[in-house]
Amino acid sequence: MTMLIQRVNILCSTVLHISIDRLNYIIANIEKFYIEYQKPKRDKNAAKRLNKPQYQERYGKYWSRTINPPHEELKNIQKCINGYLVNNIPMPDFAYGGVKEKDNILNAKQHKGRKYVFQTDLTDFYPFISCKRVYEMFVRVGFSADVASKLTKLTTFKGHLPQGAPTSTTIANLVFEPTGRKLQTL
């Protein structure tokens, strides 16, 4: 395991570019640093595929997804965190979402000619990733417990990864790395 940042003062000075006092203020008042709105979502094809009235009720109509983009100051801090993660922790080779120089086309090409392909869309993916799982990932990749705690508080909201934050995709890729490795062996 690589040793990453072990002290909060180093995190603040070299990655976040803020004082420890400002860090503590943001964490203590994190709800002031996010916007929340509902985004309508519709999947008319799911109702056709499932062809069951109880599913058509949900999937054949609009429902909403909660979006929590951060305000500018926290967004800039999260961009710094994301840059540090991307530059210092190798992304899993099977991760394509949010990874530079990878896209859906490259992902599809690796499955070309396979007899079986499994595809799924995880409903409420980011809300499913709890702050506990994010904290455990930060410790697993090499941050100290104290730094992992601060990073978790800066990158999660209401107990989970927020939809709309610049760090969410990278963190999700890292959180699910052990699961992805298990799936690769099937």
Feature map (PLM): residue ranges:
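Localized chelating/binding microdomains
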Residues: 18-26, 42, 61-63, 67, ...
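Short linear loop/turn motifs
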Residues: 25-32, 98-100, 149-156
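A general alpha-helix detector
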Residues: 7-8, 80, 133-137
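Non-catalytic, polymerase-adjacent accessory regions of viral genome-replication enzymes
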Residues: 1-54
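An N-terminal domain-start capping segment
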Residues: 1-12, 99-100, 104, 142, ...
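Active-site-proximal segment of RNA-dependent polymerases
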Residues: 73-120, 124, 169
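Conserved polymerase palm-domain catalytic core
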Residues: 110-186
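Short, conserved non-catalytic motifs in the polymerase core
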Residues: 34-78, 95-97, 153-173
